[in-house]
Each structure stands twice: as structure tokens, then as C-alpha cells.
């Protein structure tokens, strides 16, 4: 009953290109929303105003969020996991990580990914190939985050070993 109300609120917030998975099983007395996007805090606050269940947040990355959903630990998991071989987001991961799990996929957000560099880009960083240079150091995301998966896939496609990238192991 309140599960459909929750889905209606999620549908109101959707419309662009972000994936949210909601189990179709009956939601009991709590809803746990998993992911690292700030929009999820807004969603949790909105749901707390509109449904009888308690809405909680879990701040796991995309991969770990889908795993938590498969383990039955969360009701909603967001993902932005790029699949390099198909050049697509999320669906390949969802189908392989949630076998036999009924989910509803909603697209909530679209965002741009890129490198943050010092003002003026003094080192002229333009591509992943530049990350191999000795004068360039990165700050990485934790394993399982959507950004980390994207970086890992882009490095793989460029034939760059992670050991060649200064800072790769530092999160």
C-alpha cells in the first residue's frame, strides 16, 4: 500500500538519466535508501513527510548498494555504473548483480563526469593518457563507487595499468 506511494514519489522525481531500483516486495515498517548522491537526502526527507514508514539512508557506492539490495539490506539502491564493453550504464550490472530479483528501474538524474583540475589546467590534463605522467597525481574514489568503476573501465580501455597512475590506490 505505501510501497505504491513511495514509487509515485520516485516517479515524480524521475525523468532524466539515473537508475533507482526498488524491490517489488512489500516494504515493511522501514525504507532504506542506499547511494551517495545528495538528491537521495532530499528523497528521504520527502518520503519521511509522505509515508508512514521510517526512511533511512545508507551511504554505500553504486556497486555495494546493488549488492546490499541483493542481500535484502536496503529497499532502494542508486547506481551509475558504466559498462565499458557495452558503453552503457547500469542495466548490465543490475541484471548480473540482482539475479532473480524483481526490480523497477527509474532514471532520476543525468550528470557529467570529468577531471577536476587546478584553475587554468596548468598541467594541461586532457585525457586518461595524461594520468600516466609523473607530474600528475589523482585522488581516487573508493572501490565500488560509480566514479571508480568508470575510471577503472576507462583506464582498461586505454591500456593503462593502475600502477602507472600516481595516487590511484589513495582514496
What are these regions (language model features)?
Residues 81-82, 142:
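Short secondary-structure boundary segments
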Residues 97-116:
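Short Pro/Gly-enriched coil loops immediately N-terminal to beta-strands
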Residues 1-64, 70-73, 81, 92, ...:
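N-terminal hydrophobic or amphipathic helices and topogenic motifs
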Residues 26-36, 129-148:
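Short loop->beta-strand "edge-of-pocket" segments that line small-molecule binding or catalytic clefts
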Residues 42-51, 128-129, 134, 147-169:
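Ligand-binding cleft/hinge of the Venus flytrap
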Residues 58-67, 163-171:
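Short helix-initiation/N-cap motifs at beta->coil->alpha
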Residues 108, 117-137:
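Flexible hinge/capping segments at coil-to-helix
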Amino acid at each position: 500500500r505505501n510501497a505504491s506511494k513511495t514509487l509515485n514519489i520516485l516517479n515524480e522525481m524521475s525523468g532524466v538519466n539515473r537508475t533507482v531500483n526498488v524491490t517489488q516486495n512489500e516494504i515493511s515498517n522501514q525504507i532504506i535508501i542506499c547511494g551517495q548522491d545528495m538528491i537521495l537526502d532530499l528523497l528521504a526527507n520527502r518520503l519521511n513527510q509522505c509515508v508512514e514508514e521510517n526512511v533511512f539512508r545508507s551511504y554505500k557506492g553504486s556497486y555495494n548498494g546493488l549488492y546490499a539490495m541483493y542481500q535484502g539490506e536496503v529497499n532502494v539502491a542508486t547506481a551509475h555504473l558504466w559498462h565499458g564493453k557495452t558503453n552503457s550504464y547500469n542495466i548490465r550490472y543490475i541484471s548480473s548483480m540482482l539475479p532473480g530479483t524483481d526490480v523497477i528501474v527509474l532514471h532520476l538524474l543525468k550528470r557529467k563526469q570529468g577531471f577536476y583540475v587546478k584553475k587554468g589546467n596548468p598541467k594541461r590534463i586532457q585525457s586518461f593518457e595524461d594520468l600516466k605522467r609523473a607530474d600528475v597525481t589523482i585522488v581516487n574514489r573508493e572501490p565500488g563507487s560509480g566514479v571508480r568503476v568508470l575510471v577503472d573501465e576507462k583506464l582498461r580501455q586505454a591500456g593503462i595499468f593502475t600502477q602507472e597512475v600516481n595516487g590511484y590506490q589513495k582514496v
